[in-house]
């Protein structure tokens, strides 16, 4: 027997079982992690294709290896499709992740020790926007802006004051946990006053931007980064866009050979498939449903007496502030998980609790919207979440209520078939 000719279930029963069990897990829960989604069968097929065998250092028509004719076509398709999707002149589809997309922009535009101004982690920013444990916080002089202490909205006056004081080389807009729209035009006004570069990280809202449901940063930012999963419903990966082709050339060199070696051609092919899906009219309807579902989820939780940060949402994210309820984010997320609802604990702005505990939870609607959930379904989900939270306020042992909600979850998700 030649092991290299076997299928997965023949070669590695352990990994095969893990995949089977993970499929069951994904199909049997209400997925509310805001950064997760379900890719289409077409994207899955492309991602598992034999393009994984091909090394292709460099860029189309400028490779360091021969035999790249077909993968060049795949990468060019991905580039042209995403440029059309976002109406921009430059795109790089090679970043392995959103973090590496951000790193490539830093490498292209900054020198070690330069000042960067980004949203603080506890206000909803991302690790790669200057957080102390991250490379961006170690290599650069990172200054953070926060949200307003009363409204929890981005404080553009504070950003302007900090920019004038610190004269950053780069101003970063973007977030991992902020439920409201961003005024990219206002960011550009601030940037122009201090002579900085402007990077917009739209990893969470890329789908909203692509469909016109959120202001596009393309006309305002020198560089725009994103992941290709989340609201874009593609494979896990990164993306860099710009209206400025000269900056694009710098970014190309920064990513390769500056940061990465060979690109993942099977992932790039899957990105191309996702971008083609994103260009279809049905995708805009999907994004509109994602937003409507988030509003329904937020409203149902508010009706049950729970504080929703900023009073609602403009996108796919709902942040539940549990401080007045005496519940930690960790306790809530773990109890919800046992009840068949997956989300994540999340810091609340000006949170004094440990980031490993937190005072809130982050909920998101993309994944269940992909399965077919509508507003009425998310109203039910909101009440399920509230039931669990109510139980945590009143009882140390929430197991009976968790089982009750788990039964309700099972009945609801049976209406929305998963992968065949």
UniProtKB/Swiss-Prot annotation:
Alphabetized CDD domains for the sequence: SHMT
Substrates-to-products reaction catalysed: (6R)-5,10-methylene-5,6,7,8-tetrahydrofolate + glycine + H2O = (6S)-5,6,7,8-tetrahydrofolate + L-serine
Sites annotated Plays an important role in substrate specificity: 229
Keyword Amino-acid biosynthesis among record annotations: yes
Pathway: One-carbon metabolism; tetrahydrofolate interconversion; Amino-acid biosynthesis; glycine biosynthesis; glycine from L-serine: step 1/1
Binding site for (6S)-5,6,7,8-tetrahydrofolate: 121, 125-127, 246, 354-356
Cofactor: pyridoxal 5'-phosphate
Enzyme Commission number(s): 2.1.2.1
Alphabetized InterPro entries for the sequence: PyrdxlP-dep_Trfase, PyrdxlP-dep_Trfase_major, PyrdxlP-dep_Trfase_small, Ser_HO-MeTrfase, Ser_HO-MeTrfase-like, Ser_HO-MeTrfase_PLP_BS, SHMT-like_dom
Recorded GO CC terms: cytosol
Listed GO biological process terms: glycine biosynthetic process from serine; tetrahydrofolate interconversion
Protein keywords: Amino-acid biosynthesis, Cytoplasm, One-carbon metabolism, Pyridoxal phosphate, Transferase
Main localization (coarse): cytoplasm
Subcellular location: Cytoplasm
N6-(pyridoxal phosphate)lysine modification, residue list: 230
TM helices/strands, residue ranges: none
GO molecular function terms noted in the UniProt entry: glycine hydroxymethyltransferase activity; pyridoxal phosphate binding
Enzyme class: transferase
Subunit organization: Homodimer.
Protein family according to the UniProt entry: Belongs to the SHMT family.
Function as written in the Swiss-Prot or TrEMBL entry: Catalyzes the reversible interconversion of serine and glycine with tetrahydrofolate (THF) serving as the one-carbon carrier. This reaction serves as the major source of one-carbon groups required for the biosynthesis of purines, thymidylate, methionine, and other important biomolecules. Also exhibits THF-independent aldolase activity toward beta-hydroxyamino acids, producing glycine and aldehydes, via a retro-aldol mechanism.
Name of the protein described by the UniProt record: Serine hydroxymethyltransferase
The species this protein was found in: Rickettsia peacockii (strain Rustic)
């Amino acid at each position: 027997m030649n092991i290299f000719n076997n299928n997965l279930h023949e070669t590695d029963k352990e990994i095969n079982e893990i995949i089977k069990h993970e499929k069951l897990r994904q199909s049997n829960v209400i997925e509310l992690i805001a950064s997760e989604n379900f890719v289409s069968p077409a994207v899955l097929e492309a991602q598992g294709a034999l393009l994984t065998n091909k090394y292709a250092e460099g860029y189309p028509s400028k490779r360091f290896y021969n035999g790249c004719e077909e993968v060049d076509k795949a990468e060019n398709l991905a580039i042209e499709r995403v440029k059309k999707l976002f109406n921009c002149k430059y795109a790089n589809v090679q970043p392995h992740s959103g973090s590496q997309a951000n790193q490539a922009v830093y490498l292209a535009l900054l020198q070690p020790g330069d000042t960067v101004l980004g949203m603080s982690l506890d206000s909803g920013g991302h690790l790669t926007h200057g957080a102390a444990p991250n490379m961006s916080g170690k290599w650069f002089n990172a200054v953070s802006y926060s949200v307003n202490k009363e409204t929890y909205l981005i404080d553009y006056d504070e950003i302007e004051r900090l920019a004038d004081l610190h004269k950053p080389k780069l101003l970063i807009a973007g977030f991992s946990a902020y439920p409201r729209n961003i005024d990219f035009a206002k960011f550009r006004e601030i940037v122009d006053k201090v002579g900085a570069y402007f990077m917009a990280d739209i990893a969470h809202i890329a789908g909203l931007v692509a469909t016109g449901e959120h202001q596009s940063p393309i006309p305002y930012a020198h560089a725009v980064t994103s992941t290709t999963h989340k609201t874009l419903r593609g494979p896990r990966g990164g993306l860099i866009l710009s209206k400025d082709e000269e900056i694009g050339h710098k970014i190309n060199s920064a990513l390769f050979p500056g940061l990465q070696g060979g690109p993942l051609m099977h992932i790039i092919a899957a990105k191309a498939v996702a971008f083609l899906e994103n260009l279809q009219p049905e995708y805009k309807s999907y994004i509109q449903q994602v937003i409507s579902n988030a509003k329904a989820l937020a409203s149902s939780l508010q009706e049950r007496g729970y504080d929703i940060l900023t009073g609602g949402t403009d996108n796919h994210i709902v942040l539940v502030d549990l401080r007045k309820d005496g519940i930690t984010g960790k306790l809530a997320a773990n109890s919800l998980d046992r009840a068949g609802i997956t989300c994540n604990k999340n810091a609340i702005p000006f949170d004094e609790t440990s980031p490993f505990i937190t005072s809130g939870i982050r909920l998101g609607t993309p994944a269940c919207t992909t399965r077919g959930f509508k507003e009425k379904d998310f109203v039910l989900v909101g009440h399920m979440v509230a039931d669990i939270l109510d139980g945590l306020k009143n009882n140390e042992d929430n197991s009976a209520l968790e089982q009750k909600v788990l039964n309700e979850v099972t009945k609801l998700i049976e209406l929305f078939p998963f992968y065949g």
